[in-house]
Amino acid sequence: NINNKFLFGQICEGLNLPSISAAKVAHVNELKQAIDEYQQRYSAICAKPVYGVYGAGFVQLSDDVSYFMKFQSNTLCNTQQFIEAYAQLEPPIEYLIMPFLQGQECSVDIACSNGKILALVTRIKFKFYQECYIEHPCHEICKILVEHFQCDGLINIQFKQDDQGAWHILEINPRPAGGFSYTQHTGINLIAELIAEKLHLVLKRPVPTTVVQVLPIIQSIKNGL
């Protein structure tokens, strides 16, 4: 159910959690109908596959961009161009048509064991750096999700804000996110928390920092040969 983004959204809605409305399509006629409906309801819409990882297949749809934009941005596509491309799929891929939320996005990195959160840190990405928070409004939602799905290990839950600033659940990734190592700069070591729990070890924890900014640095090294 976590991997099926449509079923996941329905479960979140059933739990009265802030999910995002979505129409599932598996045929070009269904796609056209869903696009028409969602364009009438929302100022911006997007499409993403029911099954997928690392954002593969996600696009924001717009009537006002040229077909060539797809060669300049892999996340923005002309609506009619997307419909034409989808019509050529054999067999069709199940897709979701959704509102495109234009607010801030955050990633919550979590160490958990049998549905219980051991530690978590939220990351917000900016152009040149990331901010890590040990307290965040999405954490209470994460507790409900981790318990309901009995999550175990290092996972990541993604959220995005609407134009009113309210957070909505995007998805659960049942694996560590690429940037989860940034979180250690808060003083919270997610890997150590998980190992200590599983092996019944006593963990010495430093006093965590509430908010930190983390800047990635790429350094060249001279080969002595």
Report each predicted region and the residues it spans.
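Active-site nucleotide/adenylate-binding loops and adjacent lid/helix of ATP-dependent enzymes
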Residues: I2-E94, N114
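Short loop/edge segments at beta-strand edges and connector loops
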Residues: A26, P99, I155
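ATP-dependent carboxylate activation and anion-phosphoryl transfer catalytic cores
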Residues: F128-L225
